[in-house]
Design a protein with these regions (language model features):
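C-terminal motif of bacterial Sec signal peptides marking the signal peptidase cleavage site
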Residues: 3-7
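A residue-level marker of the well-folded mature domains of exported/periplasmic proteins
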Residues: 8-356
């Protein structure tokens, strides 16, 4: 979105809300917020940003989301319900970049502006999404790969047999997870091949199909195995992680969001194989934060993780809707992400993004 300017009419129809009060300013604006789920503290952090900004601006917000991020049909219904409320705007974190297209067309037809946050909807009907506020997920996935590779590159260089790197992605439907997963895969493949080794990506077909010049599984020096659980839960993510972590040739594994990273840690409770170096076990890297991940990074169970800025994303989504309704220009915003480990997680630019 290069930049859009419009305005919203005040729609004060007496709806009950649980956001900021409709005090001075804000033109009586009411916004609906549809998140991916409330199952992880990531989304609780994002809602903190929503609520704080709503109170600051004097607008009201109503927040909904399905029980799990794999509950795509439930979220689509919640989005349709939000549209039917005829709000001044909607902030949406879509679980599926395809399943919401019809609803976005309906919102466009009703002239309800939509801001996507956390994840975009690349094929949204033109004009339906006024701005996207999200991490550059491909770049963030690449950061995870770069930091992992520094630890495992000597093992790969000196290996006489095939070695394996695992990646657990919670889905193959949302733009942020797929972008992040491919960012990791492409960067890891690039780094390995630059050092003269061959790579084959195997596992979940969606991710395999995105790989350019994929190698041969039988002869590749390095296998990158990608797994996606049947549903978005820590337990099922743990099962997928265990399947990779029990293979003798596995030297590293990446959980690409809070749920899957916690799945890796849950698997490790039974296996006790995560270590700081591939000589001592399997090198683990996570994504996002939360108390479980923070503790694992602090004690060295994971060598590190990449955190986003969910509070900022929630806040900026409400600000963008407000600005649009006020007739101001709105643009896409790429929010920050940071690599953190036991050494830097207390630093001023890192610590505020490490939510519990």
């Amino acid at each position: 979105v290069a930049g859009l300017v419009a305005g919203c009419g005040s729609k004060d129809d007496g709806k009950a809300t649980d956001g900021g009060d409709s005090g001075e300013g804000g033109g009586g604006y009411h916004f609906e917020v549809v998140v991916k789920s409330f199952q992880s503290t990531y989304w609780q952090a994002a809602i903190t940003g929503v609520d704080t900004k709503a109170e600051e601006l004097g607008v009201t917000v109503n927040k909904t989301g399905p029980n799990a991020e794999s509950d795509i049909a439930d979220q689509v219904q919640q989005l349709n319900n939000a549209i039917n409320q005829n709000p001044d705007g909607i902030a949406l974190a879509a679980n599926s970049q395809d399943a919401v297209l019809e609803a976005l067309q309906t919102a466009l037809d009703k002239e309800i502006p939509v801001v996507c946050f956390d994840t975009g909807v690349p094929n949204a009907p033109e004009g339906s999404v006024i701005a996207t506020i999200a991490t550059d997920n491909e770049a963030a996935g690449a950061v995870a790969a770069e930091n992992m590779y520094e630890v495992i590159k000597d093992t790969i260089a000196n290996a006489t047999d095939q070695v394996r790197i695992g990646e657990v992605n919670q889905d193959a439907t949302s733009a942020n997870i797929s972008g992040r997963g491919m960012g990791f895969i492409n960067k890891m493949k690039e780094l390995i091949e630059a050092d003269g080794k061959t790579v084959a990506v195997v596992g979940n077909q969606y991710y395999v199909d995105q790989v350019e010049n994929n190698g041969d599984e039988a002869s590749a020096d390095v296998i990158i195995e990608v797994a996606v659980p049947a549903q978005t839960t820590v337990e099922l993510s743990s099962t997928e992680a265990s399947n990779i972590m029990t293979k003798e040739d596995t030297i590293a594994i990446f959980g690409s969001n809070q749920v899957t990273a916690e799945g890796v840690l849950t698997a490790n409770q039974n296996l006790s194989v995560l270590a700081a170096t591939p000589e001592d076990g399997i090198v683990g890297v996570g994504f996002d934060a939360g108390a479980t991940l923070k503790a694992a990074v602090a004690d060295g169970t994971l060598i590190g993780a990449v955190t986003q800025a969910p509070v900022d994303q929630g806040s900026l989504a409400i600000q963008a809707l407000y600005d649009y309704c006020e007739g101001k220009e709105v643009k896409d915003i790429a929010t920050d992400s940071y690599w953190y480990d036991a050494e830097n997680m207390e630093e001023d630019d890192i610590a505020p993004n490490l939510y519990d």
